[in-house]
């Protein structure tokens, strides 16, 4: 993006000295101010938490503290002009035609902006021109194409927490998708990672501890706006329903509270009713494979661990022709499904597209972002080129429809059925909008020729002006005999007939003098005056009529919003399925098979992203079942353990979003969750060490993994002392085998853990092979049965460039340690007696665990206290 130039300043503006800056504080008692500043301050009071863009002619001006802040954030000049209430008025301005670029920068910084436009006619105003805030731009409520990321949904999320229950409501204003769910408060972090909202809406009495370390901009609302009954009323009024049962939301009161607050907040920012928000849907976590925040980060689904957009799974798969497809792809990757029937339909569609994806892409290349254009139509913010793009996109869909309908896939045929053959919207727009309309309605040149006879006549006056003047000049020369006569126009005096002074005595009686010059006279005739009146008003009248016709067209499009949203969804799904087919064809992916029994059987699996980045990738098998639940993986650092574990998680995830998978074959049983404990770093904002982060993630796995979960554990226990880490790793592995019984890939450098395979039939040792030759190590990246023979730590250090002297010292010290270890008998950590069972709890402790202090009245609490004392005695 080109740099936005600093706007030209008004003449007579002086820079503020430091001394002046320190004095420029404005009192809010408006009688001391000029009428215009009174108007500004009244608007500012209503939007005190936002920057106020105040329209003055061709500029948006910011005043006082807003001017200081904008100057700092946008690097525009801070100035002062005049005074109000005895203080210099700090101000900074930006040209209105460049406002979108500045808004984009402010929104990326998390700022919200209220835009006040002139709505009165300056010619009729006796005081300041009437102004009002017509739009509020916040990070989560963007709809303008210039402010949005084409490939990512822009969500605003409302959070409501009541007695340990988490209610979430989120909305993409750019698409109209409105969803809710309820969960446990402990799920907040994972949901924020999944949804990645651009803005949070929370009650202002919510404790900030819950949002510690979360940099997402937050809008705080009064708690009463989250009231359940008020929210139900707001939602049913908006949707025109008696209750929320039809949406499945009647049993989710905390989420309904969030949804009501969110809807009212969004309405307050738009200035119009968001009619495209036509339904509320409940997200059922039970239908999805759940992943916590750490898992989504570690698998690098849509951004790398470093926060970059590539290389990720999404960047690899995203060959979508439309922005709608790219956004839906990201959504699918974060929402893997458990329903094998629905997945089989997606896999069938991918199979049918394997030889036709190029044709689908060619057709979809002509389709614009129907989804976001539809939302702008509903919000009445659609620009002329939005409508021409919508018209052209609907025209192009006939080819896509025919292609999808011809393929052997139930899902593709259903999607084809949604696409129109002849769209009434397309016909309406073809008649109303010019083939290449102007960018902005204010410039005219938007409404098609022939759509309005009155508009055609007004345009003809402007177009025929030159011809009329030439004909009039020729006729007047012939009538008067004045060969030097000229008919001309200027902005000051309008149209006139100019005659030299030497021939001014020849002018007819109907000539009326308009201006006298040194060597000429200028005249006007009744005919020329009549034409002048028509010509000078024709442009203004044409612009006013175009605006009127455009607004009427938006009204006519409103009933078709729901239909257009369905079309957009169908196009996006076709686009994603075609991208899946392209990756499957290029990467030689296999169609996965689902079975009801516990199984994860992958033959020649590959890591999809790493495979695309290297010349040659070593494929590996994975076999897990009810009898073989945990693979204990050993081998050298850089040997490929982490890549091997991640590839199995990604293959599993790809199968559950409807894609083919990078393997020769994959047979997968029921999966409910995917967990990863891979890598860690200090959580400085949360005040947690690397080891604390590691243990928190491990605790989450041990407390929530089931026999249908896939668990990846990499080097657990390495962040503490050797014996502490070894003991923890052993106990964690044991718990995963005995209690959770999850499918587990457990990578470790603690070779002592390999003895677990002798204790538990469900444990199998595997290792990543490597060979050492002349103090050099070669990683083979191949998974083989059995434990690794050694760690190759010194060889890896040498490969990393550690100085040779350090390597020699390490070898010498390693030999000494190995000799000492062989000379003394070391206690066998794993032959120690089984841990004693936990002591039975006392009756008082049993009773204490049953109590929920949040629901007790003071009297009940006192009674229970006496009861506990009696039990303790």
Curated annotation (Swiss-Prot):
One MF annotation (Gene Ontology) recorded for this entry: damaged DNA binding
Pfam families cross-referenced by the UniProt entry: MutS_I, MutS_II, MutS_III, MutS_IV, MutS_V
Binding site for ATP: 635-642
Composition bias, Basic residues: 8-26
CDD domains noted in UniProt: ABC_MutS1 (cd03284)
GO biological process, one term: mismatch repair
Sections of the chain in a coiled coil: none
Keywords assigned: ATP-binding, DNA damage, DNA repair, DNA-binding, Nucleotide-binding
Cross-referenced SUPFAM superfamilies: DNA repair protein MutS, domain I, DNA repair protein MutS, domain II, DNA repair protein MutS, domain III, P-loop containing nucleoside triphosphate hydrolases
Listed PROSITE patterns: DNA_MISMATCH_REPAIR_2
Region span, Disordered: 1-34
One Gene Ontology cellular component: cytosol
NCBIfam families recorded: mutS1 (TIGR01070), PRK05399.1 (NF003810)
Function: This protein is involved in the repair of mismatches in DNA. It is possible that it carries out the mismatch recognition step. This protein has a weak ATPase activity.
Similarity section: Belongs to the DNA mismatch repair MutS family.
Name of the molecule in the record: DNA mismatch repair protein MutS
The species this protein was found in: Chromobacterium violaceum (strain ATCC 12472 / DSM 30191 / JCM 1249 / CCUG 213 / NBRC 12614 / NCIMB 9131 / NCTC 9757 / MK)
Lineage: Bacteria, Pseudomonadati, Pseudomonadota, Betaproteobacteria, Neisseriales
């Amino acid at each position: 993006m080109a740099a936005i130039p600093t706007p030209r300043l008004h003449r007579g503006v002086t820079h503020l000295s430091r001394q002046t800056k320190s004095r420029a504080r404005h009192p809010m008692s408006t009688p001391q101010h000029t009428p215009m500043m009174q108007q500004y301050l009244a608007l500012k009071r209503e939007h005190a938490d936002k920057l106020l863009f105040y329209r003055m002619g061709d500029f948006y001006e910011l005043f006082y503290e807003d001017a200081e802040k904008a100057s700092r954030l946008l690097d525009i000049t801070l100035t002062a002009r005049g005074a109000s209430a005895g203080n210099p008025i700090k101000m900074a301005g930006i040209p209105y035609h460049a406002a979108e670029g500045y808004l984009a920068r402010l929104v990326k910084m998390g700022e919200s902006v209220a835009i006040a436009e002139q709505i009165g006619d300056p010619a009729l105003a006796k005081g300041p021109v009437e102004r009002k805030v017509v739009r509020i731009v916040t990070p989560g409520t963007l709809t303008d194409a210039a402010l949005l990321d084409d490939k990512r949904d822009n969500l605003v999320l409302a959070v409501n927490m009541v007695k340990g229950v988490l209610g979430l409501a989120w909305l993409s204003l750019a698409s109209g998708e409105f969803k809710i769910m309820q969960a446990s408060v402990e799920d907040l972090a994972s949901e924020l990672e999944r949804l990645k909202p651009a803005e949070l809406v929370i009650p202002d009495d919510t404790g900030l501890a819950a949002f510690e370390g979360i940099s997402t901009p937050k809008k705080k609302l009064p708690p009463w706006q989250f009231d359940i009954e008020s929210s139900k009323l707001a939602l049913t009024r908006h949707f025109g329903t008696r209750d929320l049962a039809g949406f499945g939301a009647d049993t989710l009161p905390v989420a309904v509270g969030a949804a009501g607050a969110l809807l009212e907040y969004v309405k307050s920012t738009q200035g119009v009713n968001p009619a495209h928000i036509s339904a509320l849907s409940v997200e059922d976590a039970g239908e999805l494979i759940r992943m916590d925040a750490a898992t989504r980060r570690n698998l690098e689904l849509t951004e790398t661990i470093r926060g970059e957009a590539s290389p990720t799974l999404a960047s690899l798969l995203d060959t979508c022709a439309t922005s709608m497809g790219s956004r839906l792809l990201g959504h699918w990757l974060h929402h893997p499904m458990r329903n094998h029937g629905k997945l089989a339909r997606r896999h069938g569609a991918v199979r049918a597209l394997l030889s036709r994806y190029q044709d689908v892409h060619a057709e979809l290349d002509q389709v614009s972002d129907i989804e976001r254009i539809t939302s702008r139509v509903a919000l009445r913010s659609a620009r002329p080129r939005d409508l021409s793009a919508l018209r052209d996109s609907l025209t192009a869909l006939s080819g896509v429809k025919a292609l999808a309908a011809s393929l052997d896939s139930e899902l593709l045929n259903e999607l084809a059925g949604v696409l129109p053959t002849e769209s009434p919207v397309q016909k309406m727009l073809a008649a109303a909008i010019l083939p290449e309309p102007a960018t902005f309605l204010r410039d005219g040149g938007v409404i098609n020729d022939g759509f309005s006879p009155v508009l055609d006549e007004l345009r003809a006056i402007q177009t025929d002006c030159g011809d009329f003047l030439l004909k009039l000049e020729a006729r007047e020369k012939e009538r008067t005999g004045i060969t030097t006569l000229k008919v001309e126009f200027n902005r000051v005096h309008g149209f006139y007939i100019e005659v030299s002074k030497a021939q001014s005595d020849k002018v007819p009686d109907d000539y009326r003098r308009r201006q006298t010059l040194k060597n000429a006279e200028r005249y006007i005739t009744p005919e020329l005056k009549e034409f002048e009146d028509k010509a000078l008003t024709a442009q203004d009248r044409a612009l006013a009529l175009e605006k009127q016709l455009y607004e009427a067209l938006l009204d006519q499009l409103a009933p078709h919003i729901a239909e257009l949203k369905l079309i957009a969804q169908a196009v996006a799904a076709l686009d994603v399925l075609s991208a899946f087919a392209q990756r499957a064809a290029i990467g030689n992916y296999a169609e996965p098979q689902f079975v009801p029994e516990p199984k994860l059987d992958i033959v020649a699996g590959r890591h999809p992203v790493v495979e695309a980045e290297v010349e040659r990738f070593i494929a590996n098998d994975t076999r897990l079942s009810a009898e073989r639940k945990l693979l204990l993986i050993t081998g050298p650092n850089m040997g490929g353990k982490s890549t091997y574990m991640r590839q199995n998680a990604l293959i599993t995830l790809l199968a559950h979003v409807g894609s083919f998978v990078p393997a020769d074959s994959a047979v997968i049983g029921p999966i409910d969750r995917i967990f990863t404990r891979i890598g860690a770093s200090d959580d400085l904002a949360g005040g947690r060490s690397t080891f604390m982060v590691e243990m928190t993630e491990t605790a989450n796995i041990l407390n929530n993994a089931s026999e249908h979960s896939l668990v990846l554990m990499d080097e657990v226990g390495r962040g503490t002392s050797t014996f502490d880490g070894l003991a923890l790793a052993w106990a964690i592995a044991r718990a995963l085998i005995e209690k959770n019984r999850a499918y587990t890939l457990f990578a470790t450098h603690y070779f002592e853990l390999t003895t677990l395979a002798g204790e538990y039939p469900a444990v199998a040792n595997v290792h990543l092979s490597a060979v050492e030759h002349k103090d050099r190590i070669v990683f083979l990246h191949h998974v083989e049965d059995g434990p690794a023979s050694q760690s190759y730590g010194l060889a890896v250090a040498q490969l990393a460039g550690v100085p040779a002297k350090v390597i020699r010292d390490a070898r010498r010290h390693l030999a000494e340690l190995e000799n000492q270890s062989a000379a003394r008998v070391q206690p066998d950590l794993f032959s120690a007696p089984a841990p004693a069972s936990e002591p039975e709890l006392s009756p008082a402790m049993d009773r204490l665990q049953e109590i929920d202090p949040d629901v007790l009245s003071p009297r009940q609490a006192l009674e229970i206290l006496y009861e506990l004392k009696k039990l303790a005695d």
